């Protein structure tokens, strides 16, 4: 995943309604009509949000007659997560002797150092 893709996903997830849509889809595939029942938005507004989520491949859709069903693209979320997991705290890159006794405050297993 490149920086442009990550930026696009962050922008897509920067909207409260789209985050709520993702949280509903965590439980499995949903019809657009089911999503509409949970929100106070119009069908065109839902379509707009779903297009943004689909364009960055966070959700996938399928048609069944006149109905559209959406589900999370788990592989895309895994790639997104791995991008952030690959970011290493600069303190972890230093040797223990170079840290002057400071532990990283952002990583598991390290104590939180307050300045």
Ranges and model annotations:
Residues 23, 47-49, 66:
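Base-recognition residues in the alpha-helical recognition helix of bacterial helix-turn-helix
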Residues 1-2, 24-30, 55, 74-115:
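C-terminal regulatory/oligomerization modules of transcriptional regulators
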Residues 46, 53, 70:
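Divalent metal-coordination and catalytic microenvironments
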Residues 45-49, 88-89:
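Short alpha-helical linear motifs
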Residues 7-10, 50, 81:
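A generic alpha-helix structural signal
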Residues 55-64, 71:
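Beta-hairpin "wing" of winged helix-turn-helix
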Residues 37, 48, 54-55:
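Alpha-helical residues within the helix-turn-helix
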Residues 4-42, 68-76:
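N-terminal helix-turn-helix DNA-binding core of bacterial DNA-binding proteins
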């Amino acid at each position: 995943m490149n920086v442009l893709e990550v930026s696009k996903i962050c922008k897509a997830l920067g909207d409260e309604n789209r985050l709520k849509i993702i949280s509903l889809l965590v439980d499995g595939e949903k019809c657009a009509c089911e999503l509409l029942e949970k929100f106070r938005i119009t069908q065109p507004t839902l379509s707009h949000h779903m297009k943004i989520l689909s364009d960055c491949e966070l959700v996938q859709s399928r048609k069944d007659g006149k109905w559209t069903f959406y589900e999370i693209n788990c592989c895309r979320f895994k790639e997104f997560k791995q991008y952030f997991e690959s970011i290493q705290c600069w303190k972890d890159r230093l040797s223990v002797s170079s840290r002057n006794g400071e532990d990283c405050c952002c990583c598991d297993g390290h104590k939180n150092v307050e300045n």
